[in-house]
């Protein structure tokens, strides 16, 4: 996935009201841009950190740009635009780059399922039946160990999705929790039990119920993203 237009570099001044960020561009222009991430962005929003943003030419937009990438304190690039994860996964699915999920005959997005009124990011159809996928974008890396973690904030919705997937698996339906690790240099991913122990517990219970837990790491550059390789998940 290449960015639709060249990204512009800047420095973060502050993030506020969840969806707003003030930045200073490389040319000294101060802008308020859209922050497309509802998480805490723990290692992605240090004051003064390097950021990259896409600028919109749409005169109807209230904000002139969207925050796309951050440089973490460890010098890694993280894609903070969570909407990119689903697009990246879909691109990889259609290209056959996720071997464990290859061979489907149809793909649908945002499919309702479950007793808790969830919507699966993807439903794949195979000759043997359906498969449901929940995608999570991972950008959190605590230190120099190259182990990414999810979530970066307490997520009741994430735990609900795991319960829904586990219920499917118990019925004999293939269910997949897929972590799209949008953090350069990541070598593995784990649940962030120190942030949300309930989520970690739900993930391990889902795996025991038969949910397939997969992680794929992206190559993150200022030109684009590519889902490059499978990463181990440390439960």
Swiss-Prot record:
Transmembrane segments: none annotated. Pfam families: SfsA, SfsA_N. It comes from the Bacteria. GO terms for molecular function: DNA binding. InterPro entries: SfsA, SfsA_C, SfsA_N. Coiled coil: none annotated. Belongs to the SfsA family. NCBIfam families: sfsA. HAMAP family: SfsA. This is Sugar fermentation stimulation protein homolog. It comes from Pseudomonas aeruginosa (strain UCBPP-PA14).
